[in-house]
A protein has these predicted regions:
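Extracytoplasmic/periplasmic substrate-recognition and gating elements
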Residues: 320-391
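Paired acidic/hydrophobic, glycine-rich loop segments that form the ligand-binding mouth/hinge
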Residues: 98-103, 301, 305-310
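Conserved C-terminal helix/tail region of periplasmic/extracytoplasmic solute-binding proteins
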Residues: 358-368, 378-467
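Short, solvent-exposed loop/beta-turn-alpha elements that line the ligand-binding surface or hinge
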Residues: 124-135, 216, 242-263, 337-344
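Glycine-centered hinge/linker elements that transmit conformational signals in sensory
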Residues: 199-202, 244-289
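Hinge/lid segment of periplasmic solute-binding proteins
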Residues: 6-21, 34-36, 78-81, 108-167, ...
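Extracytoplasmic/periplasmic solute-binding protein
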Residues: 24-26, 95-101, 147-169, 177, ...
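Conserved N-terminal structural module of periplasmic/extracytoplasmic solute-binding proteins
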Residues: 1-115, 439, 445-467
Length: 467
């Protein structure tokens, strides 16, 4: 019965009558073939994407609404700049008619709204029901996204499109066998999956189709690794080398010029700039040339690339669904074997978090209660379904008994770099620029360090003034 099912929630949350309160969520809409298949159904059932995950969300909402006498309402708006502009306009007009916003956390998403002072500090809400130290909230994000102990957005089991925007590598299992290469899964488990090993295997698998040159047009060449220029940054993060770290006072500290970070960039640069074995999109086409971009990435789906740097959400793309390639999933490689663990960064543009806009409505206790209930429910009832149906059984091969273990490693080793979130001085493009013209990483970064520090200081000062 509903009452029996509701006891599962009340055992955790306690009895509460929310007196018909409606939780109003504003979320962004995305292109589902771009890896955003759950942008709708993580909040409400999606009529266009039926399945067990959508059904579980419907059951969650019904149970919470009946158990606590409340309602869940979701409205959708365009993403990125349009989303930021809508919230900004509504805030200035005093016309915010939603309690929760959900979007990516980049500088054209939630971090822009935080830097404008429009969001509640989740660590400072009186009578909050959010238990952010619990495992259904992403602890890497709780610790990584704050500045000066102020936390403006968060993710966890409440959301699905955060996991989908986590960076990793696909690999072609058939090419591994054909080239008699080491099993990447065994390397990951042994802690020996490194950039050097990735590069070694990429060189071994790359094959010229017979015309004496490697290119992406003829359809005959096989590449060791394909990706985009921005994968340089992601791989450096995989070496546990963030551009910006935090000190003991939770303050941002520039670390991009640390010896380890410079060495990590140089190692990744040597691989990414090897045009005989590695192909990145921008070396052939513009980053926003979607037609040729699709053709470029089809090299992996057609079996002509050993490794493919992308995001978990690519599993939902039609090209991946239709591919006959037997593929596996891997975390980003370490800098060296002695690195303590793997590190997988995020795509901030659509790595979804939730935030609470400042409304002055005085209902944050009810808002946080419902969010906590939804997150807890998902941790118990939805996350496993998402894993099994979407990430594993939906597309990963039935004979791949290591994929779910790899997903656990990827998701439990997310690394948050504040440079990736706030993009002060367009710093996340630094490595892309060096990939095109490497005049020396140290001198390049030194010339930009002061301006970067000044931009960081301005954000910190703004946050300190917020009440």
């Amino acid at each position: 019965s509903t009452a029996d099912a509701g006891s599962f929630l009340t055992d955790q949350m306690g009895e509460k009558d929310l007196e018909g309160f409606t939780l109003r969520i504003l979320s962004t809409t995305e292109n589902k073939d771009g890896g955003f298949a759950f942008g709708t159904s993580q909040f409400i059932p999606d009529e266009n994407e039926p399945g067990v995950v959508s059904d579980a969300i419907m059951e969650r909402n019904n149970l919470i609404e009946q158990t606590f006498n409340c309602k869940i309402d979701v409205q959708f708006t365009a993403a990125y700049e349009a989303f930021v502009q809508k919230v900004t306009n509504d805030y200035i007009a005093g016309d915010i008619d939603y309690d929760v916003i959900a979007s990516g956390i980049s500088s054209n998403g939630l971090s822009a709204l935080a830097a404008s002072g429009y969001l509640e500090d989740l660590n400072a809400i009186e009578n909050s029901y959010l238990r952010l130290d619990q495992p259904w909230w992403d602890q890497q994000a709780v610790n990584g996204l704050s500045i000066d102990n102020k936390l403006f957005f968060i993710n966890g089991d409440l959301l699905l499109t955060d996991d989908e925007r986590t960076c990793m590598l696909f690999f072609n299992r058939d090419l591994i066998e054909e080239n008699q290469l080491e099993d990447p899964y065994a390397l990951v488990e042994a802690g020996t999956w490194t950039v050097d090993k990735l590069y070694e295997m990429a060189r071994a698998a790359a094959v010229d189709g017979g015309d004496g040159k490697m290119d992406v047009e003829g359809g005959e060449d096989t590449w060791g690794l394909i990706g985009a220029a921005f994968d340089t940054y992601k791989m450096v993060l995989g070496c546990n080398a963030p551009m910006i770290s935090k000190d003991e006072n939770d303050m941002p500290v520039i670390t991009m010029l640390d010896e380890h970070n410079v060495a990590a960039f140089n190692k990744v640069y040597d691989m990414m700039s090897d045009k005989d074995h590695v192909a990145y999109l921008e070396n052939y086409y513009r980053w926003d040339d979607w037609t040729n971009g699709e053709k470029f990435y089809n090299q992996f789906y057609e079996g002509r690339a050993l490794f493919y740097a992308n995001l978990i959400g690519s599993l939902n793309k039609q090209s991946m669904q239709n591919s006959s390639v037997r593929f596996g999933v891997l975390p980003l490689p370490k800098y060296e074997e002695s690195q303590s663990g793997y590190a997988c960064t995020i795509d901030p543009y659509a790595f979804t978090c939730i935030a609470l806009p400042k409304t002055g409505a005085g209902n944050l206790d009810k808002v946080t209660f419902m969010l906590e209930a939804m997150a807890y429910y998902n941790s118990e009832k939805v996350v496993d379904l998402y894993y099994e149906t979407t990430l594993k059984l939906k597309r990963l091969n039935a004979d791949d008994n290591k994929a779910e273990e790899m997903l656990d490693i990827i998701f439990s080793n997310r690394i948050i770099d504040l440079a990736n979130i706030y993009n002060w001085e367009n710093c996340i493009q630094y490595y892309n620029q060096l990939l095109v013209n490497n005049s020396g990483v140290v001198s390049f970064l030194e010339a930009r360090k002061d301006a970067l520090q000044n931009a960081i200081d301005q954000t910190v000062e703004l946050f300190r003034k917020l009440q």
